[in-house]
């Protein structure tokens, strides 16, 4: 009996649905869809409009948003199985949850917090209205989940996963990206790319400014664009974003335009460490002296079958450089742009 209890996935906390409906009633948003199904959302305040945006987003792509949310908690293995072991461990290794919880209040301003909360509140409303599509334990969605989602995913846009995979031998190379790229179009490597650039009036024949928005993303999945138009008394933006992201990360307004692209700048440093024990390292050499690793624990569950999952407990090591990975080729510390950055 103890073994069965040990393997049974913990029951989700009881959800206060009335509270979710009460919170939703404080927002006022209108969603109008054009002939292509693109939502045009109108609200008095930025939070009102973002609430409508979050609801429309959930209507159109709930399953992907749900996958992003469980990834942003480091819990994909509990729902998807052992193929997500590496990514859940990396989530804990990078201490995403700790960074968001410790920096949310101080690193994000009140207006942005209101927008993030509105998006999370909209996700909760849609979910309680469509409970048959919601995995156990996903609700309620919090502001921390939303921020953790893009804090966790951002480094993979400049191919941190490719850098990490190089640490492993070709025979033992894990899939470390939090999500598999998905697309309806399989292009040869030679014609893949992503770019964005601006042309100033001084460099155009007709003295007009041009912004070329040409980021190449999959047709579906967590890296696919979602198009929307959001209007409040203070903003009027049309553009696109990713599942689980409460703002348009590329687009236009009556006064400006902005874009982004996926590329591979030099934003990752990997340090090969001299350690006291390659199999069970507890110290590393730095500036001619031995230093103890900062040690904590990664804990998550891996789906088995039905209501059962297996608990995983694995050590997490940090050096002065950053998080530490033990690979067949050695022990490495990683420092990269965006590590534990919030806001």
Q: Where on the chain are the PLM-derived regions?
A:
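Mature extracytoplasmic enzyme cores
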Residues: 1-343
């Amino acid at each position: 009996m103890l073994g069965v209890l040990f393997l049974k996935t913990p029951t989700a906390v009881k959800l206060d649905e009335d509270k979710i409906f009460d919170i939703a009633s404080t927002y006022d948003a209108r969603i109008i869809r054009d002939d292509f199904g693109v939502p045009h959302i109108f609200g008095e305040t930025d939070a009102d409009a973002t609430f409508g945006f979050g609801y429309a987003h959930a209507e159109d792509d709930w399953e992907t948003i749900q996958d992003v949310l469980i990834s942003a908690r480091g819990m994909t293995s509990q729902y998807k199985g052992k193929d997500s072991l590496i990514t859940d461990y990396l989530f804990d290794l990078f201490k995403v949850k700790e960074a968001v919880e410790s920096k949310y209040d101080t690193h994000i301003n009140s207006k942005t917090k209101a927008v993030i909360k509105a998006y999370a509140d909209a996700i909760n409303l849609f979910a309680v209205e469509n409970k048959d599509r919601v995995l156990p334990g996903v609700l309620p969605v919090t502001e921390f989940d939303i921020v953790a989602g893009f804090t966790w995913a951002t480094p993979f846009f400049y191919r941190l996963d490719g850098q990490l995979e190089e640490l492993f031998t070709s025979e033992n190379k894990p899939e470390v990206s939090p999500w598999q790229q998905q697309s309806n179009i399989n292009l040869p490597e030679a014609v893949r790319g992503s770019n964005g650039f601006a042309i100033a009036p001084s460099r155009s024949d007709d003295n007009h400014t041009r912004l070329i928005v040409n980021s190449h993303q999959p047709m579906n999945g967590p890296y696919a664009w979602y198009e929307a138009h959001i209007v409040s008394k203070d903003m009027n933006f049309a553009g696109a974003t990713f599942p689980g992201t409460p703002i348009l990360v590329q687009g236009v307004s009556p006064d400006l335009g902005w874009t982004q692209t996926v590329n591979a700048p030099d934003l990752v440093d990997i340090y090969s460490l001299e350690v006291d024990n390659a199999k069970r390292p507890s110290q590393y050499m730095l500036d001619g002296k031995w230093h103890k690793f900062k040690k904590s624990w990664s804990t998550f569950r891996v789906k088995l079958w039905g209501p059962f999952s297996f608990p995983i407990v694995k050590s997490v090591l940090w050096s002065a450089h950053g998080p530490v990975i033990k690979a067949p080729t050695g022990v490495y510390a990683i420092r990269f742009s965006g590590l534990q950055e919030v806001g």
